[in-house]
Amino acid sequence: MKHIFKKLHRGGNQEQQNRTNDAAPPSDQNRIHVSANPPQATPSSVTETLPVAGATSSMASPAPTAASNRADYMSSEEEYQVQLALAISASNSQSSEDPEKHQIRAATLLSLGSHQRMDSRRDSSEVVAQRLSRQYWEYGVLDYEEKVVDSFYDVYSLSTDSAKQGEMPSLEDLESNHGTPGFEAVVVNRPIDSSLHELLEIAECIALGCSTTSVSVLVQRLAELVTEHMGGSAEDSSIVLARWTEKSSEFKAALNTCVFPIGFVKIGISRHRALLFKVLADSVRLPCRLVKGSHYTGNEDDAVNTIRLEDEREYLVDLMTDPGTLIPADFASASNNTVEPCNSNGNKFPTAQFSNDVPKLSEGEGSSHSSMANYSSSLDRRTEAERTDSSYPKVGPLRNIDYSSPSSVTSSTQLENNSSTAIGKGSRGAIIECSRTNMNIVPYNQNSEEDPKNLFADLNPFQNKGADKLYMPTKSGLNNVDDFHQQKNNPLVGRSPAPMMWKNYSCNEAPKRKENSYIENLLPKLHRDPRYGNTQSSYATSSSNGAISSNVHGRDNVTFVSPVAVPSSFTSTENQFRPSIVEDMNRNTNNELDLQPHTAAVVHGQQNDESHIHDHRKYTSDDISTGCDPRLKDHESTSSSLDSTSYRNDPQVLDDADVGECEIPWNDLVIAERIGLGSYGEVYHADWHGTEVAVKKFLDQDFSGAALAEFRSEVRIMRRLRHPNVVFFLGAVTRPPNLSIVTEFLPRGSLYRILHRPKSHIDERRRIKMALDVAMGMNCLHTSTPTIVHRDLKTPNLLVDNNWNVKVGDFGLSRLKHNTFLSSKSTAGTPEWMAPEVLRNEPSNEKCDVYSFGVILWELATLRLPWRGMNPMQVVGAVGFQNRRLEIPKELDPVVGRIILECWQTDPNLRPSFAQLTEVLKPLNRLVLPTPQ
């Protein structure tokens, strides 16, 4: 820069330099010029110009000069100083528009919290509006302390290129370029916007009518005001977007502008509604944050408001579907949300930083900056709606529910003695009400040991009914503390926390071998119908004192023992029965204790006797026959059981189950039309050597290294499963770019389409049979080795064949789905069927599938869509954080209602297993109570 200034000073003015050399001014005059000019330049520029002046003065001649020469020098020096000031001004203006410096300044403002209010006061209102508008354009956030001022405008880019470049047009450019096709904007201008002025007056009246403690009521009234002004509520935001597109075109044609005052927008999309709500909230001093981006809304161009209640918790405000509904924001803490600005050329939404290691507060401690984990725990400790005699919790509609502070937990004695229904209230006594959908809050006490209506209590003989705590078994031989992790549990009255879990192991996987081995010896040997699971007793077993006996015939009086840990108090009983059973089973085998050959003979004989039920050549495998038969699995040697880790890493096992045996060349498949789009790929109808098949091709073909090995490992697992209620796996294409799995083709399609098509009338007994099919298919997955957790069980993944048999599909690929619902910044996913722990991204086991089955049973019983009228974001908040459940209709059979509620237990360990569900569903003969005549 110094050389440029010298060039400006010397270039084209050689005569001035000559005159300066001939006759320089006195040194005192030189000093006057130097001291007079620094206010026009920066300190750095002054230091740079001083040597030049010094050099000029040193070159001056001590001889006196004429007045004309002195005047020429003064004019040339003044010209130089003007040029210097212009250069410095241009340099400063360029640096102020530097995007990097602007980002650094914005980051400093955001991190300080106060946003330098003193500097903002010095700026004019136009400068503040321009700064806030640019901040919202680039970073997508206006914080609680930032008020929307007049001349603030929100620009919507219709051109993706401009958005990527971070080019934000000024308000003057938008107003001068009439009808600019690349942008449209809404502006806040109270003096000229009469509609906005009226809305502000209404908001002031609403605030005066609400007490200072009724913040949720104020939020609801403001949300209803915004929604009513901008076209009303809508279940589908795409419909509102289409209406706005049409309306904006009319505005542009009539007004010849692309800038619309916010008050004149009568059909508003989410960004318009959120901005108007922010303006109204600022006017009534309601803390409100305006956030734009896909983190909350699923769309980069949508916006949402978050409000902070007096307990320092943040909630999202619904302004589209159900105005005024508050949904807890998925921040780890209200105070630990560090908003960092992102690159303006990339994602414009600031990233929220979480900490997964937030220390959990003990009871008695409190903080306004508590973590979401503590918030979830407080929800779990909250008193839920009390249970009535009909076992249905009848809770009033949820609307203004306050989740700010947990109330004391009601004892189980009070819950039992109270036969009336308590209407749920918030901490401030507001009655819970809702105008759209009635949801039930699952009472934690409904399955307590003292509850006589516990449907599954008799199925668990190892439950200590008289104790406050259940026996917690320990695993012998597992001494490495680092390999354990504590499962997150809800503190419940009268219940102990869940047992420790082995990493990468399902909850019932490790002790399953020993427990089922004991149970098999405790109960008589059962011949099971391989299709329907019917049991017939081959012989009865009794103890020496006659305490235990069993005689099971068909479906009647079936007692099924859940696979729970065996207390040490039963060790003597186990040893008591084992010798007699072993002797009876091996009386023809020369007293050899080899159980598996005998079991194989029994199965072989059963297959020969019952081959008319279904084709065993299709559903059985000679090389691996333990995939779904619990008898074979229970009698396996303990040393032969493999967990998921050892199964993947043992080379010998991998060689025995080579993927090459089920490899299908891509060229052998004749691909036809596409019949579906799943959560991980496209589904095609294809032909494979004359056989109709379904080909599921992955959308993400970038599989290499560990991911490809994981895919092949899942193929081995699916290859082993043979069950009439599991989609038959034929093979796989294991070579990119055509990674696919090939299964049987089921022409009737998904159960979802059958249940929810118009005028669908399915016989009630057929629907019961469908529920039983799903339970038996899932029991096959959960009892396999290793245990297969579906994690995406829903009616769209249940397929129906020509004989109306329901089969479980899309299993075994949960680990290949890289994004869960919360980790993915899109609305992809189906939270309507997901368990609360899955929606919260907490560790989950196979019991999450049991919750999903409860939703499926609810669908089969009611023939209604789950959570109809709510968008996915609302379902996540309702189920995952507010502990809400679907309403159980009064016309449902009480047994069916209790089964569904048992599946929806908040604590996964309290949910029944699919083995228990199968036994309970078998004698079921109705879903709905008969209509009184």
Curated annotation (Swiss-Prot):
Compositional bias (Basic residues): 1-10
Listed result of changing K696M: Loss of kinase activity
Post-translational modification: Autophosphorylated.
Main localization, broad class: membrane
UniProt keyword S-adenosyl-L-methionine, yes or no: no
Region (Disordered): 1-74, 342-424, 527-550, 604-650
All copies of domain Protein kinase, residue ranges: 669-925
A GO BP entry: abscisic acid-activated signaling pathway
GO terms assigned for molecular function: ATP binding; kinase activity; MAP kinase kinase kinase activity; protein serine kinase activity; protein serine/threonine/tyrosine kinase activity
Ranges of biased composition (kind: Polar residues): 37-48, 342-356, 533-550
Places the protein is found: Cell membrane; Endosome; Nucleus; Endoplasmic reticulum
Keyword Glycosyltransferase included in the entry's annotation: no
Protein family per UniProt: Belongs to the protein kinase superfamily. TKL Ser/Thr protein kinase family. RAF subfamily.
Entry function: MAPKKK serine/threonine-protein kinase involved in the regulation of a MAP kinase cascade (probably including MPK3 and MPK6) that negatively regulates salicylic acid- (SA-) dependent defense responses, abscisic acid (ABA) signaling, and ethylene-induced senescence. Also modulates stress response (e.g. drought) signaling and cell death, in an ORE9-dependent manner. Functions at a point of cross talk between ethylene, ABA and SA signaling that impinges on senescence and cell death.
Protein name listed in UniProt: Serine/threonine-protein kinase EDR1
Organism encoding this protein: Arabidopsis thaliana
Gene behind this protein: EDR1
